[in-house]
């Protein structure tokens, strides 16, 4: 039977999805299932690993059934996943010893402080590209080994396995035959040396984590094993893995130095490819692993905006200025500018490049002439300003010239925001026809690994651009707007 499709498993923080792509990179079928969020204590976030697996395996079957696709028509399955989330299970039984500790969970803060006290903060930064923070997997592993009865003893006997969500799904799909991750996920564990591309023995010793627990690290564009869907049909290659943000970077074909993407969600995630240079940031950005055009390891700078779409939710839910997020474009376009109004949405402090947890949100420039439209416009513009803050930091750190900005996520449907992003960054913003770029990246990696597609050059013909947003303001206006934004940010920090 002819191989016509590639399936991407997109395992996210709140739902599991399966998306089927045809040879032209068109979406043929989508299936999605939400799963339970567990909050056993303040600041703790968990998932049930078995529910993750049940939801992901069911949507895989459902996505093919909906489109009437036989499993023998599937060339490969790729995996993309929420990063950092930590699962430990028994090697013999496949039974998790504890719930998955989610990337958002802060329970291992004390362990991070202990590592800082041991003088490891700079070592971590230099060798992993990360900050010493509970966000990442390493301290979550230690917490499980320290707090689950018999876990550490079992781990030292080689009876337990660790994996991020990609590894867990691969283990389940291959019925326990394959214990593997890829460099993009390994690089988010706090245990992976991004220069040697191997597990870091110094950090394993510091956290007392047995190396035997850890998965083998294989390239992101590889065939790892095979699976049969619902136990039927032929064996399908499991062929591409990347963490969600790196998958989106590859889905946008940002495979050369200076190429960048911004995912506009609740927050914004920006990644810039820096090629074969692991750039250490002087602006608090993370250095991480990306995927190059041949599936090889590239590096990237990564930064996040805390309040993106969440700022628009605040306008709707707390201020009642809009009924729906899509209303913002209409109201923002009713005025020529913000009339001097700036919103700095530092509701939970400011992230990179400021890193000021004590900053708080504020509206500046209010006069009797300021109205709802000005405030809504200022809220949208704040997303673009914060993204520019990060992009400028990436350019300074890397020395790369930003070629263009690829965009994805829910907010890219807002033409006003995309145009202002182009205006304020003085770079062309490119919105793709297929905005499911995270899943598309996993599909591209899987398809390339099995020869379904031959090269990134071929993929460039598949990845169509829906709209180009070109800068449309002069340099003096751009500078004046941004200087005023920086002044507003400084005021939130005083």
UniProtKB/Swiss-Prot annotation:
It is an enzyme of class 2 (transferase). ATP binds at residues 13-15, 266, 309, 313, 410. Glycerol binds at residues 83-84, 135, 244-245. ADP binds at residues 13, 17, 266, 309, 410, 414. It comes from the Bacteria. Pathway: Polyol metabolism; glycerol degradation via glycerol kinase pathway; sn-glycerol 3-phosphate from glycerol: step 1/1. Its EC number is 2.7.1.30. Belongs to the FGGY kinase family. PANTHER family: GLYCEROL KINASE (PTHR10196:SF69), SUGAR KINASE (PTHR10196). Key enzyme in the regulation of glycerol uptake and metabolism. Catalyzes the phosphorylation of glycerol to yield sn-glycerol 3-phosphate. This is Glycerol kinase. It comes from Shewanella sp. (strain MR-7). The lineage of its organism: Bacteria, Pseudomonadati, Pseudomonadota, Gammaproteobacteria, Alteromonadales.
């Amino acid at each position: 039977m002819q191989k016509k499709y590639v399936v991407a498993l997109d395992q996210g923080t709140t739902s599991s999805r399966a998306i089927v792509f045809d040879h032209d990179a068109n979406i043929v079928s989508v299936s999605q299932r939400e799963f339970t969020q567990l909050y056993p204590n303040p600041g703790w976030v968990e998932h049930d690993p078995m529910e993750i697996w049940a939801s992901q395996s069911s949507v895989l079957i459902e996505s093919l059934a909906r489109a009437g696709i036989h499993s023998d028509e599937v060339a490969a399955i790729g995996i993309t996943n929420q990063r950092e989330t930590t699962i430990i299970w028994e090697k013999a039984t496949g039974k998790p010893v504890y719930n998955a500790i989610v990337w958002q969970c802060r329970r291992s803060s004390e362990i991070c402080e202990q590592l800082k006290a041991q003088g490891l903060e700079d070592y971590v930064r230099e060798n992993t590209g990360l900050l010493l923070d509970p966000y990442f997997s390493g301290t979550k592993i230690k917490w499980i080994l320290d707090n689950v009865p018999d876990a550490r003893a079992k781990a030292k006997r080689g009876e337990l396995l660790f994996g991020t969500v990609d590894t867990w799904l691969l283990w389940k799909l291959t019925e326990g035959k394959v214990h593997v991750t890829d460099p993009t996920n390994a690089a988010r564990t706090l245990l992976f040396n991004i220069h040697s591309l191997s597990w870091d023995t110094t950090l394993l010793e510091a956290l007392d984590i047995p190396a035997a627990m850890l998965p083998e690290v294989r390239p992101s564009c590889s065939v790892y094993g095979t699976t049969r869907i619902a136990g039927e049909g032929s064996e399908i290659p499991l062929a591409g893995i990347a963490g969600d943000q790196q998958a989106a970077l590859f889905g946008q074909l940002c495979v050369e130095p200076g190429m960048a993407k911004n995912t506009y969600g609740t927050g914004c995630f920006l990644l810039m490819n820096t090629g074969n240079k692991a750039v250490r940031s002087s602006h608090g950005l993370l250095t991480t692993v990306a995927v190059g055009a041949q599936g090889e390891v590239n590096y990237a700078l990564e930064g996040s905006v805390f309040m993106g779409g969440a700022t628009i939710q605040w306008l709707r839910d707390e201020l009642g200025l809009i009924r729906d997020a899509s209303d913002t474009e209409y109201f923002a376009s009713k005025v020529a500018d913000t009339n001097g109004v700036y919103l700095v949405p530092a509701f939970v402090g400011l992230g990179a490049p400021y890193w000021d947890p004590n900053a708080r949100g504020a509206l500046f420039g209010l006069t009797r002439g300021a109205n709802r439209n000005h405030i809504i416009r200022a809220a949208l513009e704040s997303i673009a300003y914060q993204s520019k803050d990060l992009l400028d930091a990436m350019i300074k750190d890397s020395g790369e010239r930003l070629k263009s900005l690829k965009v994805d996520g829910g907010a890219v449907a807002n033409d006003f925001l995309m145009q202002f992003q182009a205006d304020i960054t003085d770079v062309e913003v490119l919105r793709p026809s297929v905005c499911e770029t995270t899943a598309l990246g996993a599909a591209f990696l899987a398809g390339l690994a099995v020869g379904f597609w031959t090269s990134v050059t071929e993929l460039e013909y598949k990845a169509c651009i829906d709209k180009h947003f070109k800068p449309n303001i002069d340099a003096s206006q751009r500078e004046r707007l941004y200087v005023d934004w920086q002044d507003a940010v400084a005021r939130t920090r005083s």
